[in-house]
């Protein structure tokens, strides 16, 4: 409204393994006649109020990029919907806009088929996906046990089971994040920053005139969050080593 733009839909985004507050988003969308597409690239595998991500709105998209909870060895992704019409259109768009006949294109489409090798890898990984989610929870619990008195650790509401795409901590205000990251790098501990430049500061969105004051929490988090190593096969010894180095830097 502020920028005289007619909103037609909402793209909700799961982050670090947790879905967005989908009940509130769906309620708002229904009241305002909007569609909802959920970006579950980082939250695939998680649950929200005993419902699996992928079943929470009109359409859910996910990514099979290697860094995601269910990752292939290359690029890939999928859509989830209970709407037969949307599913039919998506299948058509995936293959050049194809209609019922192979050489009859009924809409503008693309080449977006998942290649056979990635599909085979995903089928094998899907068989162990639930177990890997449980292992990620064990890793997260150990990190939290080690670090909850020294940094701000992730908060997970009781009605959410996270897929722990990342384990992201908030550093104390007096800590220089670049120095912290360089210190861990010197100890052969990789880290990642998601995301140093918020969406409203990206060039394509500057035309919307969003002030820093309006999104001051976003700005603060973009400068203070950092993600520690996270995958299902981190053992306790490694987690404790990483945790001890985090504690050592912050205390000293």
Where are the predicted features?
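PLP-dependent aminotransferase class I/II
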Residues: 1-3, 9-13, 18-24, 31, ...
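A conserved catalytic-core signature of glycosyltransferases
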Residues: 74-75, 117
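Active-site phosphate-binding strand-loop segment of PLP-dependent enzymes
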Residues: 1-72, 78-80
């Amino acid at each position: 409204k502020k920028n005289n733009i007619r909103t037609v839909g909402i793209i909700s985004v799961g982050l670090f393994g947790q879905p967005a507050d989908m009940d509130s988003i769906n309620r708002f969308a229904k009241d305002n006649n909007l569609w909802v597409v959920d970006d579950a690239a980082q939250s695939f595998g998680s649950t929200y109020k005993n419902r699996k991500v992928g079943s929470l709105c009109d359409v859910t998209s996910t990514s099979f990029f290697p860094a995601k909870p269910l990752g292939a060895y290359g690029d890939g992704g999928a859509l989830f919907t209970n709407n037969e019409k949307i599913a039919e259109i998506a299948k058509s768009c995936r293959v050049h806009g194809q209609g019922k006949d192979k050489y009859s294109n009924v809409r503008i489409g693309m080449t977006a088929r998942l290649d056979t090798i990635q599909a085979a890898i995903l089928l094998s990984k899907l068989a162990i996906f639930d177990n890997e989610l449980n292992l990620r929870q064990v890793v997260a619990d150990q990190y939290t046990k080690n670090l909850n008195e020294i940094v701000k650790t992730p908060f997970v509401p009781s009605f959410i089971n996270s897929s722990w795409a990342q384990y992201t901590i908030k550093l104390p205000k007096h800590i220089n994040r670049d120095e912290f990251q360089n210190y861990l790098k010197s100890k052969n501990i990789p880290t990642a920053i998601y995301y140093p430049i918020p969406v409203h500061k990206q060039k394509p969105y500057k035309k919307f005139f969003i002030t820093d004051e309006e999104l001051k929490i976003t700005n603060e988090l973009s400068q203070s969050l950092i993600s520690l190593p996270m995958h299902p096969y981190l053992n306790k010894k490694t987690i404790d080593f990483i945790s001890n180095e985090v504690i050592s830097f912050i205390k000293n």
